Amino acid sequence: MSEEYTEKFKEAKDKILKAQSLNELEEVKRIYLGKQGFLTQILRSIGKMPQEERAKWGRLANEWKEELETLYENKERELKYLTLQKKLEGEKIDITLPGRRKILGRIHPINQVIEEIVTVFKEMGFQVVYGPELETDYYNFTALNIPSDHPVRESHDSFYIDKEHLLRTQTSPVQIRVMEKKKPPLRVVAPGKCYRRDMPDATHSPMFHQIEGLAVDTDITFAELKGVLTIFAHRLFGKERKVYFIPSYFPFTEPSAEMYVECGVCKGVGCKACGYSGVLEILGCGMVHPEVFRIVGIDPEKYTGFAFGMGPDRIAMQIYGIDDIRLFYENDIRFLKQF
């Protein structure tokens, strides 16, 4: 029996030293040092040995166990080092390779267009002002001469928070706030977000941007309004693009008009972006209604003014040749990185 155990001990040492992987080493440990290993068998059989043999085999088993565990730990350390070296060799960075450039953030195309528009009007003497996105029914509708029974005031067209508050449907309330606080002459533009219950399609979004413009002074005429907006259109789109003014109706202006420009996507031929009409509405405008002046305490007999409101989202579509407004809001980096 002593020869058998001695051979097992030598065999265990040999297999530990020759192990080529951590898995192989772990298997050797299980066979020789585990619960069913030969050292455990020796310790279990000591009780059956003659009295004079027990001390000898007990001491020998503990010495062998200590030696094998030391060998195992050394071999494990060696194999872990070799495994790590092999892994590092495979993952070694070649410093001669070109580095990867970080993707830089960019200003959103709609914000770029808003900045361009605002810059044009600032150069014409307009001041930039802002107002709250959460508005009262008074500023959003009543002060703008919109009748109480007008469809736009219904909940199916607007996002009401409660009976008196809603997400503004236009940036026009800003002009009311400005006229309440400041005296003419006034020239302001008010960019910002607006909200309406529109189903998303190629030209509509429930959240969109608008820039409101207002000028108030003595002797302002519709001809001045047309001149300012024509200069703006030519600065933004180029003098080769045709501009059209078509009579329209808005409760807060009289007379009123809509300004159209030749579609930049199809060059006037007709496409999805312009509803196959060849032109695209850019803004609504008109002379400030006398009733609006009365509401804010400005004498309509002394002062006149014009107002306009435009959608930078649609203008961005024209500038960049985009035929679907939804692309601006999908956060697709492949699309946004083009601007």
Curated annotation (Swiss-Prot):
Sequence similarity: Belongs to the class-II aminoacyl-tRNA synthetase family. Phe-tRNA synthetase alpha subunit type 1 subfamily.
CC cofactor: Mg(2+)
Species whose genome carries this gene: Dictyoglomus thermophilum (strain ATCC 35947 / DSM 3960 / H-6-12)
Location, primary (coarse class): cytoplasm
UniProt protein name: Phenylalanine--tRNA ligase alpha subunit
This protein's UniProt keywords: Aminoacyl-tRNA synthetase, ATP-binding, Cytoplasm, Ligase, Magnesium, Metal-binding, Nucleotide-binding, Protein biosynthesis
Compartmental location: Cytoplasm
Manner of cofactor binding, per the entry note: Binds 2 magnesium ions per tetramer.
GO molecular function term, any single one: tRNA binding
Classification via PANTHER family: PHENYLALANINE--TRNA LIGASE, MITOCHONDRIAL, PHENYLALANYL-TRNA SYNTHETASE
Gene Ontology cellular component list: cytoplasm
EC number of this enzyme: 6.1.1.20
UniProt-listed GO biological process terms: phenylalanyl-tRNA aminoacylation
Annotated Mg(2+) binding sites: E254
Gene: pheS
Nucleotide-binding keyword on record: yes
